[in-house]
Amino acid sequence: MTDSALSLLGLALRGGSLAVGEEPVREACKTRRAALVLTAADAAPGSADRARRWAQERGVPWVRLPWDKETLGGALGRSLCALAALTDRGLAAAVAAKLVRADEDLRPALVSLLNEKKNPRAKQKPAVPET
């Protein structure tokens, strides 16, 4: 399951829906584009704390991933990656679902995205009635 989550992160990067690195993640949170903030298992404590704080300030789910910086970076075509933020809500929900399937302990942190995945129309605007 987690390998497919890594694949989705690579797809998000290629599609321009993944902010990678401390400054891009901070900016994605600040501009309210971040849908899910991720930190590598071995991210520096200060970096992980900042990412968590940025996410919490904006009500964005945050999770520490089961992969180290090298594994996460390798999936993204980089040598290392400690912080990332998905900016596409659909991809964020898909990654959240895969992470929870692999580790049920992540469910509380990702419940808002999992609920969106179950009911994708809940966030859509209602149809305008014809007149």
Task: Annotate each language-model stretch with its function.
Residues S4, G46, W67, G90-A94:
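Charged, alpha-helix-enriched surfaces in structured cytosolic catalytic cores
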Residues S4-T39:
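N-terminal first-folded block
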Residues E57-L83:
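Mid-chain, well-packed structural core segment of small domains
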Residues A34-L36, A41-R53, V60-P61:
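N-terminal positively charged helical leader segments and presequences
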Residues L8, V20, A97, V128-T131:
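Long, amphipathic alpha-helical "stalk/connector" segments that mediate intersubunit docking
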Residues S112-T131:
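Charge-patterned, long linear interaction tracts outside catalytic cores
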Residues G73-N115:
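C-terminal structural segments of small proteins and small subunits
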Residues E23, D42-A43, W67-E70, R89:
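Short, ordered loop/turn segments at secondary-structure junctions
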